[in-house]
Amino acid sequence: MSTFGYRRGLSKYESIDEDELLASLTAEELKELERELEDIEPDRNLPVGLRQKSLTEKTPTGNFSREALMAYWEKESQKLLEKERLGECGKLAEEDKEESEEELIFTESNSEVSEEVCTEEEEESTEEEEEEEEEDSEEEEVTTEVTKHINGTVSHNGVNPDNSKPKTFKSQIENINLTNGNSGGTQRNTESPAAIHPCGNPTVIEDALEKIKNNDPDTTEVNLNNIENITTQTLSRFAEALKENTVVKTFSLANTHADDAAAIAIAEMLKVNEHITSVNVESNFITGKGILAIMRALQHNTVLTELRFHNQRHIMGSQVEMEIVKLLKENTTLLRLGYHFELPGPRMSMTSILTRNMDKQRQKRMQEQKQQEGHDGGATLRTKVWQRGTPGSSPYASPRQSPWSSPKVSKKVHTGRSRPPSPVAPPPPPPPPPLPPHMLPPPPPPPAPPLPGKKLITRNIAEVIKQQESAQRALQNGQRKKKGKKVKKQPNNILKEIKNSLRSVQEKKMEESSRPSTPQRSAHENLMEAIRGSSIRQLRRVEVPEALR
């Protein structure tokens, strides 16, 4: 009955016209109906994360322009690329202002502002784009004028002093020409400070090269580390200049994209130069060919003590490592090698080579010190002897004098003439009369005979040796065996007693505790031992008893 009643309730909606109902609905009711239908039957083409209905009721403030957003991103990326290429470290104040205005404009376009404000911002953005295009054209004109001035054709006089951006661009170009070493002139920039590389290395390449060529006494180290825009030809020029230099001690060009050509130029320099003690070519593009060229050059170099070539782009390989060890076997001056050998064999042999070199350097240093001491000692020998002869001052204070005067002993000199007459001694008293015999004391008892005691142990080693020698002589003279045995046992017993007396009490206790207990023999064992030790000659005939006959 329930199902029939439900169908009966639905039958009344069959005669209703749907179009009339939809036409009678308002706009808000239609939106609500669409939301309900979306929840009931979502669009299958949309991903699952986007099928839910939007819960935000904020009205859009303006039309979204994808082209404007793409243009803004392209412009920002171009600016970043230019800054990286020019090596600009800090931002100028005007650029900061312009970028902040552009960011404000871009954010305000997406904020809750009316459409009228949005149109005004679009007009401002178009005006700023036109201004930037004009500034770009001015920068291009400045660059052309600067290049003409460098080539020596036109003088640089057409720059507007009010515009600070072209000036900064000009200074950046001049700094690049100075650091890269590609410009032919010697123009200096007086308006801007010294050029700074993006890597942070403040070395000016052209100045450093000139100092090396002029053999400047202040430049003992050439540091070209992390300069990426330096060319292989420039590195070769440095190597050529260092051939005749006598001041530079350290030459480092880590992370400069140096290749085998630069390594071969450095090898040629090491064959000639006798003053450089440290070379660093780590983190470059040098292969095994360039490294082996440097190792062959070290066979003719007796000054270099440190070489670093680890972390190259190409792997050296086992063959190159073994060849390095072979080439460095004859070298006796290299003390530090900056490379991690992959194979254990070359690694251990290289460690032994470096240890040998360090030991030789230590011996050489000690020998030089001895020679210096010998030269100094010959000159100051007399002074040393004189110093030994003179008494040195005592570190202790002198003893204080006693407040009491010491007693004076009068010396009496007795002579024969001045000797006074000696007084006459009185006569001795007469002896007492003898006592009667019954009054005499009893005589003392006779002394007891000495007890036969043990012989005292003498610790005189000389006496023991004499006794041993006498015993040996007695044996050699052909005395009887019994007598020889007794004499032989006597020194042995004395030696044992000496050893026991010299031992400590703890050692004796340890010996007694560690010594096993002597086993007690039975009567049967004694009988069997006597039978074993007897012979037929010792046996005697015994009559057989009558009971056994």
Curated annotation (Swiss-Prot):
Stretches for region Disordered? 91-166, 179-200, 358-455, 469-534
UniProt subcellular location: Cytoplasm, Myofibril, Sarcomere; Cytoplasm, Myofibril; Cytoplasm, Myofibril, Sarcomere, M line; Cytoplasm, Cytoskeleton
Question: Residue ranges under compositional bias (Basic and acidic residues)?
Answer: 358-376, 496-514
Q: Does the keyword Ribonucleoprotein apply?
A: no
Region entry Interaction with actin 2, spans = 165-499
Matching InterPro entries, A to Z?
A: LRR_dom_sf, TMOD
Superkingdom, taxonomy of origin: Eukaryota
Instruction: Give one GO term, molecular function aspect.
Output: tropomyosin binding
Q: WH2 domain spans which residues? A: 523-542
Q: Residues where Phosphoserine occurs?
A: S11, S15, S24, S406
Q: Which UniProt keywords apply?
A: Actin-binding, Coiled coil, Cytoplasm, Cytoskeleton, Phosphoprotein
Q: Provide the assembly information.
A: Can bind at least three actin monomers and thereby provides a nucleus for actin filament formation. Interacts (via N-terminus) with tropomyosin alpha (TPM1) (via N-terminus). May also interact with TPM2 (via N-terminus). Interacts with FLII.
Q: What is stated as this protein's family in its record? A: Belongs to the tropomodulin family.
Known role: Mediates nucleation of actin filaments and thereby promotes actin polymerization. Plays a role in the regulation of actin filament length. Required for normal sarcomere organization in the heart, and for normal heart function.
Protein name per UniProt: Leiomodin-2
| Native source species | Rattus norvegicus
